[in-house]
Regions:
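NAD(P)+-binding Rossmann beta1-loop-alpha1 motif at the extreme N-terminus of oxidoreductases
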Residues: 4-56
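Short acidic low-complexity segments
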Residues: 60-74
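Rossmann-like NAD(P)(H) cofactor-binding subdomain of soluble oxidoreductases
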Residues: 77-80, 84-142
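Rossmann-fold dinucleotide-binding core
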Residues: 116-214
Length: 255
């Protein structure tokens, strides 16, 4: 049988999620993993993620660098594991070196597809997960992280990629990956992008400018007003989804 050509994946971003994904992927020995990070000197070539049953994903990185030109041209797939506010600058950093690589984001609800269309162009090969595959927390930066939770099912949108692209991720992440019909289904979210502002409004809408004695707990002290605002925001969101022809479960269905 013909020898399988190993894919090279570049992870952009060195936080908890980047480290966990890099550990899981390199642990499979199915892919070569490299990391583009602002702090390469703080990274070990040997990394690990530990889940809450004690299972350890140990991996060895092929390369760690802060220079896109040293790491992007030889990569087949580029995966951004970054908070939303860093995605645009990261896309601009890698853009000069992107030829036909697949470029994606570990979560798409912060505007990845909109920014990638603008910066990489309409013919770029793009993919994005709807939600993150893991809950992650750093143990030691650049060395180890805790994998605190798995998702049973992942959803991905792709553009200009072959039909078997999701199947590769099923193999690498050992999790089912379903195909979304277009990028808006991955980009429009009534999860955190609505949940957080609704709760913040509930906490601060009547603030008088004084310093509080105690911290308000975000979830543990959740109140009726935050729920009412969240549900009202979702109703407006559902009207938008209906207009653009996108189906996303309502908050009341989902939670």
């Amino acid at each position: 049988s013909s020898k399988r050509i190993m894919k090279t994946i570049c992870i952009c971003g060195g936080g908890a999620l980047g480290l966990v994904v890099a550990s899981v992927l390199s642990h499979t020995r199915e892919v070569a993993v490299r990391v583009l990070t602002a702090h390469p000197q703080q990274w070990s070539k040997s990394i690990e993620a530990v889940d809450n049953t004690g299972k350890v994903y140990q991996g060895v990185l092929e390369k760690v660098s802060d220079r896109a030109e040293d790491i992007i041209p030889q990569s087949d797939i580029v995966l951004l594991c970054l908070p939303g506010f860093l995605i645009e600058q990261s896309l601009r950093q890698i853009a000069p070196y992107v030829t036909n690589q697949a470029v994606g984001s570990i979560v798409s609800s912060t505007g990845f597809f909109f920014q990638a269309h603008r910066i990489l162009g309409g013919s770029a090969s793009l993919f994005g997960f709807q939600r993150v595959p893991y809950v992650a927390r750093v143990r030691e930066y650049g060395h180890s992280a805790d994998l605190l939770g798995y998702k049973q099912q992942l959803y991905m949108a792709t553009e200009n990629l072959s039909d078997d692209f999701e199947a590769k991720w099923v193999e690498w992440l050992q999790t089912p990956v379903a195909h979304l019909s277009n990028y808006l289904e991955a980009s429009l979210s009534n999860s955190n992008p609505l949940l957080h502002p609704a709760r913040l409004y509930g906490m601060w809408h009547d603030w008088k400018g004084e310093t509080y004695k105690d911290q308000t707990l975000f979830y543990a002290q959740w109140d009726e007003l935050s729920s009412e605002v969240y549900i009202a925001m979702d109703e407006e969101f559902q009207k938008l989804c209906c207009k653009v022809g996108v189906k996303i479960p309502s908050v009341l269905d989902y939670y």
